[in-house]
Amino acid sequence: MRASRCCWETAPVHEARVSDGVSIAYETFGDPGDPPVLLVMGFGAQMIAWHEDFCAMLAGGGRYVIRYDNRDCGLSTRFHDHPVDMSRFIAAVSGGDIPAAQAMIPYSLRDMAGDGMGLLTALGIEKAHIVGSSMGGMIAQTMAITQPARVLTLTSMMSSTGEPDYGQAAPAAQQALFSPSPPDRQGYIDASEKELAWSSRRYANAGAIRELAARSYDRAYYPAGIGRQLGAMILAGSRADALKTLNVPTLVIHGLDDTLVDPSGGKRTAELIPGARLLLVPDMGHDRPRELWQDLCDAIEAHTRFA
């Protein structure tokens, strides 16, 4: 397998080689001597979706915060040589031909979890607190399942277990998620307002959505990776049995207004993981509005305080 890495960027970032052929772009906030917190972003989103002010707020609470681009996104390694025909992929999955579907996707959710662990290794960090959002929550769960000794605590935000009966999207949110965005900059920014379909209704902010879309487009527009990430997520299957045996202190955070991953996904996650605490946030959708940052940081800081 040959992968290629983006070689241009609009702002300096650090880069770490985490495995053969895969490099991960990352940024850090705070004092390296503080307890490390690894932030794992979701489907198709760059690390800047963890806003730098949010990261600084978390770091201000005495945490060494690390955010990074998942593979096939942002400034991390891109898998140009593996184009995916999503129609064929979906047909294979729907028809039960999982081996054929797997052959179309060059990596798995486990590989993506390995990237995060590899980044910690490259930074000389043996153990860390892991915080994952949406698909990032699935990746974070996988980190805790596959390498529990390296996970001090797990925080799974607006995510689910991979079971089909939990965490399903509302039809309008699902339609918005999979509606194609124009390839030109202005069209992409305008189309980003579709995210209002799953945003926190009370704090809905089209301006903030458009600002992130513009920054993401200018930093590293790369829609080709989305299909491969989606394939890895679909093929990951259920983590239910593994979560039942997890022995990692876990906090599950889910917005009660989430229409992209129904709150049943968070409730089910907390139900399965022994000793997990569940924080259901009123007025929060499938996003992290600035108005809730302090509450979210306080919850993460409290959860990571004693591990």
Stretch-by-stretch model annotation:
Residues 20-99:
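Conserved HGGG/HGGXW glycine-rich cap/lid loop of the alpha/beta-hydrolase fold
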Residues 98-99, 106, 110-128:
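Conserved acidic catalytic loop of the alpha/beta-hydrolase fold
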Residues 137-148, 154:
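Short glycine-enriched nucleophile-adjacent loop
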Residues 145, 154-183:
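Flexible "cap/lid" loop of the alpha/beta hydrolase fold
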Residues 169-241, 248, 268:
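Alpha/beta-hydrolase
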Residues 246, 252-254:
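Short beta-strand/loop motif that positions the catalytic acidic residue
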Residues 257-261:
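Acidic catalytic loop of the alpha/beta-hydrolase fold
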Residues 276-307:
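Catalytic active-site module of serine/aspartate enzymes centered on a nucleophile-bearing elbow/loop
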